[in-house]
Amino acid sequence: MKILVDENMPYARDLFSRLGEVIAVPGRPIPVAQLADADALMVRSVTKVNESLLAGKPIKFVGTATAGTDHVDEAWLKQAGIGFSAAPGCNAIAVVEYVFSSLLMLAERDGFSLHERTVGIVGVGNVGRRLQARLEALGIKTLLCDPPRADCGDEGDFRSLDELVQRADILTFHTPLFKDGPYKTLHLADEKLIRSLKPGAILINACRGAVVDNTALLTCLNEGQKLSVVLDVWEGEPELNVELLTKVDIGTPHIAGYTLEGKARGTTQVFEAYSKFIGHEQHVALDTLLPAPEFGRITLHGPLDQPTLKRLVHLVYDVRRDDAPLRKVAGIPGEFDKLRKNYLERREWSSLYVICDDASAASLLCKLGFNAVHHPAR
C-alpha cells in the first residue's frame, strides 16, 4: 500500500508508516507522476483536489489535515467512489489564540480595555464557539452571526450581519468559503460592509482570504477610513496584494491555525479515519507525539488583569513574530509558501503550566485554556 503525504504534515511519516509505504511530496504542486500507483493521498489546504488531479488514478482515499475543505471537490470524490476525511476543529484552538494575541497587542498599542469592546463573531462553528466561550469567560460582550445555524434551529442568540456591523467594535470572521448559494460568503465583507463599520473598528479575517474583498478593503484604507485590520488570509494566495499588506496592522501568511498541537490533531484525525477506512482502526494519544514545551512552569502572583494576560499570551505566542517576516519578503515569488513550510514551532496556551496564588486567577486561566493550578501563598 502506497500512501502519499504532504511533506509538511507533522508526524505523518511515523503514523502512516504503520499502514503502508509512505512517500512525502510537496503539496503545491503535487507531483502527478507519484499518483500513478498510490492508494491514498493526504494533503493540506494548499493542494487542490479535484477531477483534474485524480481522474484515472488509483487513489482510493483522500484525507486533508485541515478543518476547511473548500480546496477539495467532495462531490466529485463521492461520485468517483473515493473515500474522504477532513479534520474538523483540529486547529480551532490555535485560531482562537491567534485572535487573542492580535487583540491584546492592539489593545496595548492603542490603550483600550477589551472589556469596553463588543466583539462580533461571524461564523459560530468550531472556532467561533471557542472564541465566544473565552471572550465571555473574561466578561467581554459578544454578538453572534451564523445564518445557516440560525436557520437550522441551533442553540444561540444569533443576530443579523447588519446588526453586528452596526454594534460591534471588533468584527472577526470564522466562516467557510461558499462561492454561491443562499449562504454565500465570497466577499461577505464587501465595500458596503467595510464602509459601514464603526469608526475605529477592528476587522479580523482568519478563515479564508476571499471572505473579505481585498480590493475593496484597500480602497477604504487608502481613502483614510479609520480601521484596524488583522489579516491572516489573503485573496489569491500564495500571491497577495503587497500594497494591502502595508496598510494593515497585522499581516501573517495563513498560519493562524499553525500550532504544533493543531497540526498534530489534523494528522492524527486523518490517520485514524484512514486506518478505519482500510479496516485496521487505530487511535493515537496526542500527548504521546508532542515534545516538552519550551517553558515548563511559571508562577503568577495576584489577580489576572489585561496586562498580565497579555504577557502570558505573548509568552506562548506573540503574533508580531509572524507579521515582520511576511513584510520582509512580500511580493517575492515562493516566499509566502516558504514561510509556511519553515514555520517556527508554536505551542498552545495549554502547554504553559501556571502556578497561581490567587484562586480566581487560576480558575479563569483554566477557563481560557491554560494549564493552571492554585497554590496559596505562604
Swiss-Prot record:
One of its GO terms (biological process) is 'de novo' pyridoxal 5'-phosphate biosynthetic process. CDD domains: ErythrP_dh. Belongs to the D-isomer specific 2-hydroxyacid dehydrogenase family. PdxB subfamily. The keyword Cytoplasm applies. The keyword NAD applies. Catalyzes the oxidation of erythronate-4-phosphate to 3-hydroxy-2-oxo-4-phosphonooxybutanoate. The gene is pdxB. One of its GO terms (cellular component) is cytosol. This is Erythronate-4-phosphate dehydrogenase. It comes from Escherichia coli O157:H7. Disulfide bonds: none annotated. NAD(+) binds at D146, T175, D232, G257. GO terms for molecular function: 4-phosphoerythronate dehydrogenase activity; NAD binding; protein dimerization activity. The active site is at R208, E237, H254.
